[in-house]
Each structure stands twice: as C-alpha cells, then as structure tokens.
A protein has these predicted regions:
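Metallocofactor- and cofactor-centric catalytic cores in central/energy metabolism, strongly enriched
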Residues: 1-237
C-alpha cells in the first residue's frame, strides 16, 4: 500500500485513500505528514520523560501548534514546506534532549532522517497502519485528529494574543501517550474524552480572542442584492 489516509469523511470507498487522496493529496505528501506527526510525538516524549515545563519552552509550543496545523485536511500539501518543518522539528527535539536527562526514549525521539528519500523511507514504518489492533488504531487516530483541531484553534487564538499553557501540557501528554503500547482501548477511550474536554477549552480560548478583538457577534442587517461593483466571495469549510 503506497499510502493510507482516512482523516476526512470523503475517503475512497469510505475506508481510506491508498493511492492518491480524493482531496488531491499525493502519496509522498501523505507520508511526509505522517513523519511530521511522528516527529512531534517524539518531542512530546522528550518533554514528558524529561519533565520539561511547557511554560518554559514557548517557541517549541508554537512550533508544535504549527506542525499539527500543517497536517489537517486540505491545509498544506506543499511537500517542500512539510519536509522543511520535519527538519526543523528534529532540530528542536535534539535541542531539548541536550538540556535534560530523559531515559527510555521512544524511537520517535531518537531517529534521524536527512533529506527527502530518507524521510520517505522512515515514514513508511510509522504510518497509521503500523498499529495492528483496529480498535487501538482508531482511538489513537481519533485522539490525533482531535489534537490537530485543537492546534488549529490554539494557533488562531495565538494570532489574536491568547494562549493557555495547559493546552500545551495536555498536547505533550497525549501525544507521548500515543507512543505507549501499554495504553489499551480503555485507556485510550479515557484519553479521547479528555481530548474533547481540552478541545472545548481551545474553542473557548479562540472565542475569547475573537470577542476581545472584534467584539461580540450581533444580528446585523446587510444588503444581499446584486451590484455592478466588485465583490468578495467568502467560502467556509
């Protein structure tokens, strides 16, 4: 199987895209996205096992948000940009490791991949289907997608001057847990529920950012007629 992605509701045959995404995503882009997520999990492993306080690593926090946000549905299919981000996050990971004593690190916190070919080769061994148990796999991915959505909200909130260090703490904890094979289905169900809780907190943070900057939404009358002057077409996803 050249790729596997079932991140959205429009996947091929409602099972997953295995040759090319229905969205147009190419195989190599899907694999690079998988490796970027794996790299962020490795950073989380270092943060958790090295007992690093999220409040003390703001730049790392922001890069983690950016990395997760890059992999959401239809956000970024630029292979060069994703490859560059993988390289950056490996460097970030190594910088963290140099500052702490963290024993028993996972492969995600240890591997290196220099260049596109090496990255694609590594990506083939860390994709979604590496988790054989379907229930565990599904729960892990549900949590991952929840974290991606959370990162998107948190990134937008950050651009509005709002952030919450507790969100970063949870993200690191959750992503590190996704590397732990001792986490069974029951543990992952509990983590899924917590992911939802923090997702709501991220939404509240973004709402606070929007309302503090733009005010509270109000019912407003607008002209919906057609004119000859230029218009702006707005679409949503």
């Amino acid at each position: 199987m050249s790729m596997f992605c079932f991140q959205c509701q429009e996947t091929a045959m409602n099972k997953g895209c295995t040759v090319k995404g229905v969205c147009g995503k190419e195989e190599h882009v899907a694999k690079l996205q998988d490796l970027l997520i794996y790299t962020v999990k490795g950073i989380s492993d270092v943060v958790v096992k090295g007992k690093i306080e999220a409040a003390g690593i703001p730049e790392v926090n922001h890069e983690v948000l950016r990395s997760l946000f890059m992999t959401i549905t239809n956000a970024n299919f630029d292979a060069d940009a994703i490859q560059k981000q993988i390289t950056k996050m490996i460097s970030v990971r190594e910088g963290l490791k140099a500052k702490v004593q963290a024993a028993g690190l996972h492969d995600a916190a240890l591997f290196n991949a220099d260049g596109r070919d090496a990255m694609l080769e590594k990506a083939a061994s860390v994709g979604v289907l590496v988790t054989e148990n379907e229930d565990v796999r599904s729960l892990r991915e549900m949590i991952t997608y929840g974290l991606k959505g959370m990162a998107a909200y948190a990134e937008h909130a950050l651009n509005l001057g709002k952030e919450d260090v507790d969100l970063y703490k949870f993200m690191y904890e959750a992503m590190a847990s996704l590397l732990d094979n001792s986490f069974g289905a029951d543990d992952l169900v509990a983590l899924t529920l917590r992911t939802g809780e923090y997702g709501v907190k991220a939404m509240a943070l973004l709402d606070a950012g929007n309302t503090s900057k733009y005010g509270n939404p109000e019912i407003t009358k607008v002209n919906i007629g057609v004119r000859k002057n230029p218009a702006i077409l707005i679409s949503g996803h």
